[in-house]
């Protein structure tokens, strides 16, 4: 599912909201998550999961084409850990779909 499909689904489930308003809300939520992560904050959505930033140290890498060793700078990468409720729901739905197959 891409962002536009998410916006469309939310708008369909909430007919009192205009699709443009839903799009603005979704964009605002995503912007706030990114801003918080950029500050180094952890963003926790209970039952859904938690977003955080992991810092990877500088290391020696290798160019796969030439085999040459190259330095790779340190970097920060986003990390998402699923919440307990999400894991349980996914496992429950997977078990149900496998049983009916």
Curated annotation (Swiss-Prot):
Gene Ontology terms: cellular component: chromosome; cytosol
GO biological process: DNA recombination; regulation of DNA-templated transcription; regulation of translation
A Pfam entry, by short name: Bac_DNA_binding
UniProt keywords, alphabetically: DNA recombination, DNA-binding, Transcription, Transcription regulation, Translation regulation
GO molecular function annotations of the record: DNA binding; structural constituent of chromatin
UniProt keyword DNA-binding, yes or no: yes
Coiled coil ranges: none
Annotated InterPro entries: Hist_DNA-bd (IPR000119), Histone-like_DNA-bd_CS (IPR020816), IHF-like_DNA-bd_dom_sf (IPR010992), IHF_beta (IPR005685)
SUPFAM superfamilies linked to this entry: IHF-like DNA-binding proteins (SSF47729)
PROSITE patterns documented for this protein: HISTONE_LIKE
Function per UniProt: This protein is one of the two subunits of integration host factor, a specific DNA-binding protein that functions in genetic recombination as well as in transcriptional and translational control.
Assembly with partners or alone: Heterodimer of an alpha and a beta chain.
Family membership noted in the UniProt record: Belongs to the bacterial histone-like protein family.
Identification of the protein by name: Integration host factor subunit beta
Source organism per UniProt: Nitrobacter hamburgensis (strain DSM 10229 / NCIMB 13809 / X14)
Upper lineage: Bacteria, Pseudomonadati, Pseudomonadota, Alphaproteobacteria, Hyphomicrobiales
């Amino acid at each position: 599912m891409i962002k536009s499909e998410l916006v469309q689904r939310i708008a369909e489930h909430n007919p009192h909201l205009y699709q443009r308003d839903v799009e603005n809300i979704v964009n605002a939520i995503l912007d706030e998550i990114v801003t918080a992560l950029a500050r180094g904050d952890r963003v926790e959505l209970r039952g859904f999961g938690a977003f955080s930033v992991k810092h990877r140290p500088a290391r020696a890498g290798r160019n796969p084409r030439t085999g040459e060793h190259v330095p790779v700078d340190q970097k920060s990468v986003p990390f998402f850990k699923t919440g307990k409720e999400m894991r349980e729901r996914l496992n429950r739905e997977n078990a149900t779909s496998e049983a009916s197959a």
